[in-house]
Amino acid sequence: DESLSANGEGPTLFSVMDHCATAMGSREMRRWLREPLRSTEDTSARHDAVEAIMGDEPSREHFFAVLDALPDVERIASRVSLGTVRPRELASLRDTLPTLSALGASLADSPLDLIAGIGRSMTLNAEIWERLEQSLVSEPPGMLRDGDTIASSCSPELAELRHFRDDTSRILLEMEERERAATGINTLRVQYNKVSGFYIEVTKGAADQVPMHYQRRQTLKNCERFITPELKSIEDRALSSKERSAALEKELYDKLVAETAKHTPELLAAAKAAAQLDVLCAFARHAAENRWHRPKLSSRPGLDIRKGRHPVVETAIENYVPNDCRLEDGRRMLIVTGPNMGGKSTYMRSVALIVLLTWAGSFVPAAAAEIGPIDRMHTRIGASDDLAHGRSTFMVEMTEVADILRHAT
């Protein structure tokens, strides 16, 4: 994937091929290009899938639309298994897994085994996202410490703690109304300050009307302040509700993550399948847009490329001159000669890249191509001296050529 890359700059085979909608797909494409197949059956299955997707543009664009909405399920699933996943990442799974699973179900009956297998892997147990739907608020914060991640409906205790945390003033007013009605003291007030905490205040004249369970907390010039067991309980819970709700929320969140982690293998399999579908769609789109054709796989050693083009160079120039290349039992070597900048290296690279693309499962930039079995590819293009080890440029070149000849089959 470093084709025509100048010190990491400029277009590469990967950069021109990467039409993937997801980060997972881009990583998978890089793996396919770096690790081409050797099995004719597996490679043909990829070609069949690319051909089918290429011929159905509406479905291809629908696939891209679904994939484009996906988060990085692979990375999120890994963080779930490690217990380091963030609330918004879990929410992104909750929001997108139903659509992904529905797409998988629609593909599971495909007549193509590769597509059907991808569909089955993408079809997930609804229990995964249903549990997330029940447990998470609609828009959780970025970090758990920010609070309000778990839905109050999940835990009566959490709901009560948040009730005390957020509605202390209303709780005091409700108690004030109840106590006024119970005692008949219309001037009774239930209040709070940082010095005295929570208290019931009555005027001096009404102090003798308070019930027996009122405990005197403070005597002032014009009023008396009392506390009751109920108010003391409210005080304790209100003052500690923030810390306790945060601790309980973390406990519930950790439990949710642990339950989700049980489905990590399914999530990773679905992510892998989605990435494969993404690559196949990207291959199909690139082939459709650039007039690439399906290569034919042969059991005979050799290759026959008609009007082959360099997949990177053709994107940079308008009038690319295609070339043929044929190698077989009676024609196992070509010696290519020509002036500097005459296209020798580009020609050799185009042949190598067409072979690589073939066994990666892609269509190729050629009018036709028949490619035999390939077990390895060696290149030696460009060299410089190695004075530190006493090797001239010529010596470096000959050493590299010798290494190629030793390992060639």
Task: Report residues per predicted region.
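Alpha-helical coupling/stalk and coiled-coil linker elements that connect catalytic or binding modules
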Residues: 1-342, 346-378, 400
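Switch/coupling sub-region of P-loop NTPases
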Residues: 376-409
